[in-house]
Each structure stands twice: as C-alpha cells, then as structure tokens.
C-alpha cells in the first residue's frame, strides 16, 4: 500500500507525509508483520510490528519509538477494519450493540473486544453493509475514524480515504494511492537485528 497522510503535530501544525506499507499475514493481527515507511519533509524512518513487538528503523539502525508514536501505530492495526474482519482469528468477541439513524444514515453498531481488552465500535451502514466509521478510546481520548471512497482493488473493497479525529478534532487524513494484494514481501524488511 502506498499513500499520503496529513498529520497534525504536537504544535498544531499539519505535516504532509508519504508512506508505504507492507504486511505479511499471520494467524492473527498480533502475529502479523507490518512495516510502514514514513517520509516527512525533513526525515524518513520506518515503524515495524513483528514478533509481537513494535520498533523503529532509521538509517538501518533500530530504535525504540516514543510511547505515543508506538501506541498510535498499534492503534491503526488493532482498531482498524481487520479487527472486525478477522475477529475469529484474533479470539475477539462480537456484540450487536444496537441500531440507530445518525444524520440520516441507518447504522448497525458492532462492538469488537479483543483478548487484550481493546474495544472498537463499528458503524455498519444498514443499506450498503460497509463500515462507515469506528470509535475507540485510549487514555481517556475518544477516537473516531471515518471511511470514505470505497473502491475495489483486486476484488477487495478498500476505503481509499480515511479521517481520524481525537475528541472531535481532526488529527489525521489518509489517502491511499495504490494497494496491491498477494505480492511476495521480503522477510528482511521485518528484521530488527536482534
């Protein structure tokens, strides 16, 4: 997957980031190998989740990312669409939490709670059966990710545009440029040198 993100930094300024993401599927989300290379205007580094650990790579040197950066990266993994699509493999529980009309759209609410206690609410359109948004909480902050521009990529329906808010303030906007499934990914991308 290759795309662009607009991120709001600690100072409230928006930064444009190009990213490239590689994934090797595991038996569950916790066992997957995921690497995201991020290129900011002034720096380029990678965040990697492999062997149930998160670490960074900068100029081929391994580093421990800040706690907030690691948590944000892990939230993209564990509070994403895959949490619902792969709930059985993850050992998660599903609860149908109701049905409601919000701003003219009829939604089913599905709560997914994984083995680690992470809870994500999915808002599924009763008309299209697509996930239109998700909610989760982390450290007292309410996050909401909205999904837009669903299109097919190799027979898989993918939201090409997402917006993440924290306590109703936009902190991230992502636009996928290209996505490819089924390609061989070199395992060396996920080596941490230990």
Sequence positions of predicted segments:
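Short structured motifs
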Residues: 17-18, 93-96, 145-147
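N-terminal mature ectodomain segment of secretory-pathway/periplasmic proteins
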Residues: 1-61
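A short, sequence-level motif marking secondary-structure junctions
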Residues: 20-25, 50-53, 69-73, 125-128, ...
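A structural detector for beta-sheet-dominated domains
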Residues: 2-4, 8, 25, 37, ...
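Well-ordered beta-strand positions enriched in small/hydrophobic/aromatic, beta-favoring residues
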Residues: 1, 34-36, 54, 94, ...
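Gly/Pro-enriched, hydrophobic low-complexity segments
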Residues: 105-192
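Flexible, processing/modification-adjacent segments and terminal tails
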Residues: 53-118, 126, 138-141, 185, ...
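Short, ordered beta-strand-loop transition motifs
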Residues: 25-30, 99-106, 153-154
